[in-house]
């Protein structure tokens, strides 16, 4: 998700927090939890891939327990697409268990209201986003994507890696 987020045009008062240097997938969910604690008066928007989210999903329970209201855009491409782009799209180790993401908030905190969406089309995403802007509860929007739907920036990086590695 960091490769796509790097290309976003954000409002001047927005802050983008990413940690791409060490390739530490799973960082953003707990980072969003901490960011919401640090800036309780602001709305955190988390963009996270499904593979990364599976590594630290327990922090969703902390967010709900503390009644945080982030907007979570979970990009579901059924695995580690960055790794697929680098190591090949058919490598089995880049596949993950398929979860029912919209049931997780209730599993972690059944008494805390939340809102969940699963979207497959642009107009559904717009509807979910418009409904979520003023929401007073945690909102999870599962965005269904093709396995190899990658941003141009990532495509450029992986092509450069392939060229470099082919000369070795």
Named regions from a protein language model:
Residues 3-168:
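Thiamine diphosphate
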């Amino acid at each position: 998700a960091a490769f796509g987020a790097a290309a976003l045009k954000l409002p001047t008062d927005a802050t983008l927090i990413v940690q791409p240097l060490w390739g530490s997938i799973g960082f953003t969910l707990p980072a969003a939890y901490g960011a919401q604690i640090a800036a309780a008066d602001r709305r955190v928007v988390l963009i996270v891939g499904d593979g990364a989210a599976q590594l630290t999903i327990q922090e969703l329970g902390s967010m709900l327990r503390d009644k945080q209201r982030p907007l979570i855009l979970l990009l579901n491409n059924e695995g580690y697409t960055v790794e697929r782009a680098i190591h090949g799209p058919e490598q089995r180790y880049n596949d993950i268990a398929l979860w029912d993401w919209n049931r997780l908030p209730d599993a972690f905190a059944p008494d805390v209201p939340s809102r969940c969406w699963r979207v497959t089309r642009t107009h559904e995403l717009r509807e979910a986003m418009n409904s979520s802007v003023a929401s007073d509860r945690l909102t999870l929007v599962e965005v269904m994507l093709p396995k190899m739907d990658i941003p141009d920036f990532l495509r450029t990086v992986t092509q450069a890696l392939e060229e470099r590695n082919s000369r070795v």
